[in-house]
From Swiss-Prot:
Lineage: Bacteria, Pseudomonadati, Pseudomonadota, Gammaproteobacteria, Enterobacterales
Organism of derivation: Escherichia coli (strain K12)
Active-site residue list: D264 (proton acceptor)
Chain's gene name: kdgK
Protein name: 2-dehydro-3-deoxygluconokinase
Keywords associated with the record: ATP-binding, Carbohydrate metabolism, Kinase, Nucleotide-binding, Transferase
Key word DNA-binding present: no
pH-activity relationship: Optimum pH is around 6.
Length: 309
């Protein structure tokens, strides 16, 4: 029987500059991960569900249609009257450096745990095999909704499910660093697999040797710690099994076009192998291969035919 993973988060409308024109698309860290998992697994082994809230507008419908086309199940995505998806604009300067502007205060995704349907959705999610979320999934919620989400994660684990967390830290989405540290600590205490980006760890906790970062994460109760280091090797530490160092795929500089979804796609490649019975080392190799392919194309979601075999 197929196992089920629910990816929880927010997808936004993306506006980006293309010469003198503005191009419209959509994006979000967890959505990127869900699409790249779905592209790399047999649905008979693992089905991918995306959990968020959207409006009843045409932009929201276009998002849903696109996700269906990627074999991402949206049966647990809510549609909310009088709400819209969030929006962000990417401005690119003459050197290629990007600046992001966000409009998300009233985005539907912030309120997915406050609706009448949320209790029934949580009841269903508590029986999934895997729940995946990121720091952004937590950041956009009210403190009350965050507590509901943490309760759901604990219930899922009590039912035999596993929780997967990516530490994606965006300071502007949080009231303070202290608040984030407190929430992340609670999150790690109910996490089975943690994906850590060192830049985010350093920004939140202060710069520490990677060994200390891994030890702190294990001490919080996380069994499997995956440290993503961009173009450098990835480190995987499984409690009681030691450290695995897996080299990245090296690309010539001119091949690197856009690193927007590098981390999201690495996590997807890793999970596509790991959650279907593969070893941590093979999972990390697939993560590197996926990320190294994605960064050779512009935009977060690359053409399906460009995916590695």
């Amino acid at each position: 029987m197929s196992k089920k993973i629910a990816v929880i988060g927010e997808c936004m409308i993306e506006l980006s500059e293309k010469g003198a024109d503005v191009k419209r698309g959509f994006g979000g860290d967890t959505l990127n991960t869900s699409v790249y998992i779905a592209r790399q697994v047999d649905p008979a082994a693992l089905t991918v569900h995306y959990v968020t809230a959207l409006g009843t507008d045409s932009f929201s419908q276009q998002m849903l249609d696109a996700w269906h086309g990627e074999n991402v199940d949206t049966s647990l995505t809510q549609r909310m009257e009088n709400r819209l998806p969030g929006l962000y604009y990417i401005e690119t300067d003459s050197t290629g450096e990007r600046t992001f502007y966000y409009w998300r205060n009233e985005a539907a995704a912030k309120f997915w745990l406050e609706s009448e349907q949320s209790a029934a959705i949580c009841e269903e999610l508590a029986n999934f095999d895997y729940l995946y979320l990121s720091g952004i999934s937590l950041a956009i919620l009210s403190p009350t909704s965050r507590e509901k989400l943490l309760s759901l994660l604990r219930e899922c684990r009590a039912n035999g499910g596993k929780v997967i967390f990516d530490n994606n830290y965006r300071p502007r989405l949080w009231a303070s660093k202290e608040e984030t540290q407190q929430v992340y600590q609670q999150m790690l205490e109910c996490t089975d697999i943690a994906f850590l980006t060192l830049d985010d760890e350093d920004a939140l906790w202060g710069q520490q040797p990677v060994e200390d970062v891994i030890a702190r994460t294990h001490n919080a109760g996380v069994k499997e710690v995956v440290v993503k280091r961009g173009a450098d090797s990835c480190l995987v530490s499984i409690a009681g099994e030691g450290l695995v160092d897996v080299p990245a795929v090296k690309l010539p500089k001119e091949k690197v076009i856009d690193t927007t979804a590098a981390g999201d796609s690495f996590s997807a490649g890793y999970l596509a192998v790991r959650l279907t019975g593969g070893s941590a080392e093979d999972a990390a190799k697939r993560g590197h291969l996926t990320a190294s392919t994605v960064i050779q194309y512009r935009g977060a979601i690359i053409p399906r035919e460009a995916m590695p075999a």
